[in-house]
């Protein structure tokens, strides 16, 4: 019998944490599972609500600290979208995003855009870039067909 997918993911997460000298706490395992189960870009508040029933003692600072650890380990990506709350992406692989100015939805784009030009411009300005993300802004197809304009 095959192990449930979330169990396999938890084993892999625990191995990654241990390999980096970190403990695989129940909070870390649950937060990672919640982000994967939401299957979308989520805020720390949304993750706190998604885990509240199973871990009522979990606090928002712990959620943020855990997400930052996951980002450091390459397990999630922070998505820079406007001035709203930070969104966390369960897909750490390189990809771009589209953010709707009308409904706020953020979706993955599968186009492969090279960040080399932006990185070179940052270096030319004296900065030391270590990564780049592209977020395309506009009105999503659902809002556009409903007549939304921004």
Annotate each language-model stretch with its function.
Residues 8-21:
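Short, Lys/Arg-enriched N-terminal segment that forms or immediately precedes the first helix
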Residues 10, 27-28:
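Short, leucine-enriched amphipathic alpha-helices that occur as contiguous helical runs
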Residues 29-34:
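Pre-recognition alpha-helix immediately N-terminal to the DNA-recognition helix
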Residues 63-73:
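Basic amphipathic alpha-helical segments that dock to polyanions
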Residues 59-60:
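Short coil turns linking two alpha-helices in DNA-binding domains
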Residues 46-52:
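A short acidic, leucine-rich amphipathic alpha-helix
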Residues 72-150:
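Non-DNA-binding regulatory cores of transcription-related proteins
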Residues 24-26, 37-43:
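Short capping segments at the starts of secondary-structure elements
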């Amino acid at each position: 019998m095959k192990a449930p997918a979330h169990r396999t993911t938890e084993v892999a997460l625990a191995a990654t944490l241990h390999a980096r000298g970190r403990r695989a706490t129940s909070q870390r395992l649950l937060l990672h599972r919640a982000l994967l189960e939401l299957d979308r870009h989520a805020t720390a508040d949304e993750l706190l609500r998604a885990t509240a029933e199973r871990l009522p003692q979990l606090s928002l600072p712990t959620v943020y600290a855990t997400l930052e650890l996951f980002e450091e380990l390459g397990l999630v990506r922070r998505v820079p979208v406007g001035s709203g709350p930070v969104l966390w992406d369960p897909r750490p692989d390189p990809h771009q995003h589209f953010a709707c100015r009308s409904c706020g939805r953020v979706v993955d784009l599968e186009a492969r855009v090279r960040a080399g030009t932006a990185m070179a411009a940052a270096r030319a300005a004296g900065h030391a870039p270590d990564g780049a993300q592209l977020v395309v802004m506009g009105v999503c197809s659902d809002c556009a067909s409903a007549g939304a304009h921004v």
